Amino acid sequence: MSPDKKVAIITGSARGIGAATMKVFAQHGYASIGLDILPEGENIAREINQQGGEGLFLQCDVADERRVKECVKFVGDRYGRIDVLVNNAGVVLVKPFDEISWEEFQRTTNINLGGHFLLCKYVLPFMKQQKSGVIINMGSVSGHVGQTDHVMYGATKGAIIAMTRALAWELAPYNVRVNSISPGSVDTPMLRGDIQLESTRTSTPFEKVKQEREAEQAFRRWADPLEIAEPIYFLASEGASFVTGADWLVDCGWVAK
């Protein structure tokens, strides 16, 4: 690998926004490292390599501290640097608040917020030593507006946005930028699963629930994962060199309504 080649770690890389982001960074010349609990993430890395890029997949549960530490160390030892961290991995919980179990609360918090914490914790020593780096956390429109049956998902996303702002100030002396991106509805397996749960719970046809969600976007459609991956790359680029502590709503006007 060229000593000038930059390295990006993307979590939740097996599908959806994470897979699209991994491909975009590889297209821009990065060594694109994907982490996901799903083994299918290997397919994304293989596709990148077949197209002449540099992709690597490591199976990882972002809520498992030992495994996160191992994966970050492996990347750091192999490449000698970590330039970008995209904290994308997460889960959604769709359930009335008073029906949420303590175990569901812990799982949602551990993966969504805990995963961000662990990746930041173990990547930061590399970025501090380099005196450079970019962290992009995954917020959500749910961190800005209230949604019925999405209390825990929204709570974790709101916490991620708050963590982003505080961490941006803490890491500024090390020339490390920290931002979050908050998508609206994106056509991913997670969103389709969310719609299916709501459809089943309310006995409403899937297509009707889907159309209601699409109506929340100004363009009356869901985003393609690439439409989130490209803004993520911009936040990591030199074009965003004066941007830190920001949350970028890529929600097709949802919150502006």
What label would you give each PLM region?
Residues 140:
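Residue(s) in the substrate-gating loop at a strand-loop-helix junction
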Residues 120, 156, 164:
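Active-site helix of classical SDR
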Residues 28-43:
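Conserved glycine-rich Rossmann-like NAD(P)H-binding loop of the short-chain dehydrogenase/reductase
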Residues 125, 169-173, 241:
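Alpha-helical segment proximal to the catalytic Tyr-Lys
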Residues 117, 221-250, 255:
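C-terminal substrate-recognition "lid" of short-chain dehydrogenase/reductases
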Residues 96-97, 104-109, 213:
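Substrate-binding pocket helix/loop in short-chain dehydrogenase/reductase
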Residues 14-15:
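Conserved glycine-rich cofactor-binding loop
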